[in-house]
Amino acid sequence: MRCRLPVAYNPDAPTPTRWLAFLDGLLYPEDIPTLQEYIGYCLIPSNKGQRMMVIKGNGGEGKSQIGAVLSALFGSNMKDGSIGKISENRFARADLEHILLCVDDDMRMEALRQTNYVKSIVTAQGKICLLYTSRRMCWSILA
């Protein structure tokens, strides 16, 4: 198994009132279940759901806090970085292999001009060229 989340399932866990109150102050009420559903899709190591979410807003509203919570939940199964870098840097795509979630908490709209690689990753349509440096390949062999 390549994906192992750093959390323990607790069926008797209390209602996450602090988290829900935070979301209530950040999102419209009808958007909260959408975010929760999206996070649930991200827990599944498949891209059949073809999921990508953009949360737009002004600075200092708490969007980055969602990323911090997701980082704690997903651990090493999440990559934070630049969506634009996926299109610009041919080696950045290789870093997304076996990653459940990629978060760009400060995305520039210019990053969405070249969406062919992002679309290929989200939809799993077409071939994605993953390039590794020789050093990375050595680490993979020795690990």
Question: Which residues fall in each region the model found?
Answer:
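P-loop NTPase catalytic core of nucleic-acid-dependent motor ATPases
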Residues: 1-100
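Conserved nucleotide-sensing/catalytic segment adjacent to the nucleotide-binding pocket
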Residues: 94-131
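Conserved small/polar residues in nucleotide/adenosyl-binding loops
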Residues: 132-133, 137
